Curated annotation (Swiss-Prot):
Protein name (Swiss-Prot/TrEMBL): Transmembrane protein 170A
Claim: Endoplasmic reticulum is one of the keywords in the record: yes
Keywords tagged on the record: Endoplasmic reticulum, Glycoprotein, Membrane, Nucleus, Transmembrane, Transmembrane helix
Main function: May regulate membrane morphogenesis in the endoplasmic reticulum (ER) by promoting ER sheet formation at the expense of ER tubules.
Family matches, as InterPro entries: Transmembrane_pr_170 (IPR019334)
Cytoplasmic side: 70-78, 136-142
Keyword Glycoprotein carried by entry: yes
Lumenal side: 1-48, 100-114
A single cellular component GO annotation: endoplasmic reticulum membrane
Positions annotated as glycosylated: 29
Membrane-protein topology: Multi-pass membrane protein
Any matching Pfam family: Tmemb_170
Transmembrane region(s): 49-69, 79-99, 115-135
């Protein structure tokens, strides 16, 4: 187990694969793709979905904590933070699964490989689009 390895036959360990953006473990994978790319549908889907989930939590956790802090003395307002936390998780789980699968399906149908940075951009882009639409909907009600 030198160098953070721990896999079979010199393969990197699970933690090292996740930290190096190789999100889906490749044990005994005999594909033609390069090691630095995501080439199968589950790898692409999982990569985009995880980045969408993490970036959503990155925005919703501070917003929920801010709501909890500012509305802590309000009778019903303090429960608003629970809704914010739930939307930070349920939004990517419900819609993020579908949109990430659609993105991965387009890449797979086109026969393209996805580099991990593309998964990051597409996942964070989904969250950014949701934030823009949410902000514009709230702004329209004022």
């Amino acid at each position: 187990m030198e160098g953070g390895g721990g896999g079979l036959g010199g393969e990197p360990g699970l933690l090292q694969q996740i930290l190096s953006l190789r999100l889906v473990p490749r044990v005994g994978n005999v594909t033609d793709c390069q090691r630095a790319t995501l080439c199968s549908f589950p790898e692409m889907w999982y990569g985009v979905f995880l980045w969408a989930l993490v970036s959503s939590l990155f925005f919703h956790i501070p917003a929920g904590l801010l709501a909890l802090f500012t509305l802590r003395h309000h009778k019903y307002g303090r429960f608003m933070s629970v809704g914010i936390f739930l939307m930070g998780v349920l939004g990517p789980i419900s819609a993020g699964i579908l949109t990430s699968a659609a993105i991965a399906g387009v890449y797979k149908a086109a026969g393209k490989e996805m580099i991990p940075f593309e998964a990051l951009v597409l996942g964070v882009g989904q969250t950014f689009c949701v934030l823009i639409v949410s902000f514009l909907r709230i702004l329209a009600t004022l």
